[in-house]
Amino acid sequence: MKVAIIGATGYGGIELIRLLEQHPYFSIASLHSFSQVGECITNVYPHFQNVLVHTLQEIDVEEIEKEAEIVFLATPAGVSAELTPKLLAVGLKVIDLSGDFRMKDPFIYEKWYKRVAAKEGVLREAVYGLSEWKRYEIQKANLIANPGCFATAALLAVLPLVRSGIIEEDSIIIDAKSGVSGAGKTPTTMTHFPELYDNLRIYKVNEHQHVPEIEQMLTEWNRETKPITFSTHLIPISRGIMVTLYAKVKREMEIEQLQQLYEKAYEQSAFVRIRMQGEFPSPKEVRGSNYCDMGIAYDERTGRVTVVSVIDNMMKGAAGQAIQNANIVAGLEETTGLQHMPLYL
């Protein structure tokens, strides 16, 4: 199956290229850029030398439709909203890595993203692509809104608790930490090496755009769920996310019950690995892979459950999950082309 990538020179784009070039079923038909049209991809990223020969093309929907069946949009917020209706109109399937189609309510999108939302008709058509929890909807989708990186790690951690109804609906606290690649390719003062090295920064306190995305999904599974407390931090690593989730249970529990809850929830999910009781993962242990690793603890004194969830933000948090969703759309095994062992060193 032929695929195209729009926004091929960003970090999400080049991770898609790396994965798709090794995929046994998908092949890259074309790469597209806004600012580097006519450049050979190897001139922009020399690590693709002797692997790719693609020249970056302008975005011509009619030409893309002739060559590809699936389009990956690795574009900034706002761009996908303009492009996607045109791609859908010619029969292409779209997997969007931006946040433009994650929110069903355009007013909520505009409040958190500070930009005009996509047209409501297209928003209604979009399926939220959290692979492990939306498989059946994804199978039939023409437009998949790939989840955000923080949202992916957080939702995989909290949804078993929310679905089971065992936690207080107003008690969810999520503390999240990300490597610098999560901020994208464009440099800022905050991501500048001297500013971040040997340092730690909290950002977007109470206003991160993944908050409504997480809350929307939680209320799908339990309408009584209240607003969450969510904080994000930038840490001096290239890639990786660690989410630490806290929630208060409604009644006293045993850690064995919680362990079984998670093992049962993800027993059919090849990319979610639940650690043994008392063990907790670190981002390094999933780096370069599509895995989400989790560890669970329960504090009898406070009645709180703690879940630690780690992913590679460029893989399970972006390109890896996008290809996992493309596999589902194509009727392939979810693991096809994604069976990479983590790169520990």
UniProtKB/Swiss-Prot annotation:
GO-annotated molecular function: N-acetyl-gamma-glutamyl-phosphate reductase activity; NAD binding; NADP+ binding
Enzyme class: oxidoreductase
Catalytic activity from the UniProt record: N-acetyl-L-glutamate 5-semialdehyde + phosphate + NADP(+) = N-acetyl-L-glutamyl 5-phosphate + NADPH + H(+)
Pfam annotation, one family: Semialdhyde_dh
Enzyme Commission code: 1.2.1.38
Gene3D superfamilies tied to this protein: Dihydrodipicolinate Reductase, domain 2, NAD(P)-binding Rossmann-like Domain
SUPFAM superfamilies in UniProt: Glyceraldehyde-3-phosphate dehydrogenase-like, C-terminal domain (SSF55347), NAD(P)-binding Rossmann-fold domains (SSF51735)
Cellular compartments annotated: Cytoplasm
Keywords for the protein's UniProt record, in alphabetical order: Amino-acid biosynthesis, Arginine biosynthesis, Cytoplasm, NADP, Oxidoreductase
GO biological process, one term: L-arginine biosynthetic process
PROSITE patterns linked to this entry: ARGC (PS01224)
A cellular-component GO term for this protein: cytoplasm
Location (main, coarse): cytoplasm
Residues of the active site: C149
Pathway: Amino-acid biosynthesis; L-arginine biosynthesis; N(2)-acetyl-L-ornithine from L-glutamate: step 3/4
Annotated family: Belongs to the NAGSA dehydrogenase family. Type 1 subfamily.
NCBIfam families: argC (TIGR01850)
Function: Catalyzes the NADPH-dependent reduction of N-acetyl-5-glutamyl phosphate to yield N-acetyl-L-glutamate 5-semialdehyde.
The protein's name: N-acetyl-gamma-glutamyl-phosphate reductase
Gene name in the database record: argC
